[in-house]
Amino acid sequence: MAELAKSAVLVSSCTDDLLGDAKQVVVGPNQEDLHSAEAVLNRYSTVGFQASNLARAFSICEMMLTPQSPSPSLMPTEGDQASESPVMVQPTLFVGVTANLFGTGCREAIRFLCTECVPLPNGVEPATPLDDMAGISCDGTGALKPSPCDSRALIHVLVVSGGAMEHDIRRACESYKLSRDGAEEEGEQFHHPVERDRSRSKGTDCHFGNVRYNSSGVASRNLFSCVMRCLVKRLAEAQRKEKANREAAPIPEAYYDVCSWAITPSTLWYMAGLWMADIFTEALQETGEVTDEKVASEEGLKRAKSTVLYWAARNGVPIFSPSLTDGDIMEFILTAGDTGVPLLQLDLVADIHRLNRLAMRSRRTGMMILGGGVVKHHVCNANLMRNGADYAVFLNNAQEFDGSDAGARPGEAVSWGKLRLDSTAVKVYSEVTIVFPLIVVHVFVAWVRMMRSKGKENIRS
């Protein structure tokens, strides 16, 4: 018994082979590094704890921007005719974002990712061939069009939860404000339900965390409500035209889709992006904020350009919203019927098929998930359809002890097949607003500058 206890307690330290990659010495920024924020970030890999995980996220995001060969399972086998020179592809980058983050400064960082376009280097192909899925298609009469899925931006697919794009639009209508701390400002605590009800009836600000914005109902004549009503009205009219076109066309031999004119969330937000400048112009005049038509047009374009929607539509970034019905837009869709506007027919399933197909057709993929829940699950599940993503960066502060989707670590995604066995992934335990802007400026902004600098050098030579 004594020998058994001795052998259990006095175990030799593990060898270097068992330590794996645990060979870096822990060291922080030196005195010179402390004079530069960039130098400090460059030292994060050896700081330890979540700083080292953030440094790993930097590295993985750089990999996702780097042209490389397709995933091994998708490369030609011995029986196939392999090309003389291997194909190089730009990984398809799926980004999942929870709605609340669009109410924070992360929105501007996401807009940057949808706005900046850098041409692919010579000989490099997009990881995903052009989307040839049959969808809603119409002539130039103002009817519906599916989002093109041919992104020229830094990211290629954006998946959001319900309410995200409403925050995007609302912030182009009005400013969100920061409260001093947490949920309530000093002196604004409502200890009685009646006081809360009275406050809400007077239009007290809504809040999430320490972010506040003005609450308004569907019938309100403020700018946001006017924009949303105008959007729903345009969508209903476009759907009416699409339905008429479909009814007038001959019935195909294989007639499976009896509601082919239904609108998917990705189509809805794509059309919103295309119309955004005109909708703002119309709403500004309707509310009386601007009376001069030219000034309204200029202001409408300015506000449209401040949105993620505008740039995503302009640069071919599809926006999928699996939980669209959880957002503010549903209130405007449902109440539009009271004014004689036909209720929109929505199809959420077609978008799931399309999202999954985009992943399946991608020759190499990466995921960057901000938060958890529905966006994380749908992006990961889409990549499951291709035997897993090649890269992943998860940013959230959820724990795995309760089996939640948000709390799951990369190893759990590997067990499901959502990450490849040879994938490179990291989870950074942090509140997203702290680390995401750092990733954008340290990796994506730096990459854009580097590529444009190379482009100028090529022009000179």
Curated annotation (Swiss-Prot):
- Please give a single GO biological process term from the UniProt record: protein heterotetramerization
Q: What is this protein called?
A: Deoxyhypusine synthase
| InterPro entries named among the record's database cross-references | Deoxyhypusine_synthase (IPR002773), Deoxyhypusine_synthase_sf (IPR036982), DHS-like_NAD/FAD-binding_dom (IPR029035)
Function of the protein: In association with the non-catalytic regulatory subunit DHSp, catalyzes the NAD-dependent oxidative cleavage of spermidine and the subsequent transfer of the butylamine moiety of spermidine to the epsilon-amino group of a specific lysine residue of the eIF5A precursor protein to form the intermediate deoxyhypusine residue. Regulates protein levels of its regulatory subunit DHSp. Required for cell growth and survival.
What GO terms fall under cellular component here?
Answer: catalytic complex; cytoplasm; membrane
What does the entry's cofactor note say about binding and number? The binding sites for NAD(+) are contained in the regulatory subunit DHSp.
Q: Which reaction does it catalyse?
A: [eIF5A protein]-L-lysine + spermidine = [eIF5A protein]-deoxyhypusine + propane-1,3-diamine
Catalytic center residues: 418
Keywords recorded for this protein, A-Z: Hypusine biosynthesis, Membrane, NAD, Signal-anchor, Transferase, Transmembrane, Transmembrane helix
E.C. number(s) listed in UniProt: 2.5.1.46
Which protein family is it in?
Belongs to the deoxyhypusine synthase family.
SUPFAM superfamilies reported for this sequence: DHS-like NAD/FAD-binding domain (SSF52467)
Membrane-related topology note: Single-pass membrane protein
Q: Which segments cross the bilayer?
A: 428-448
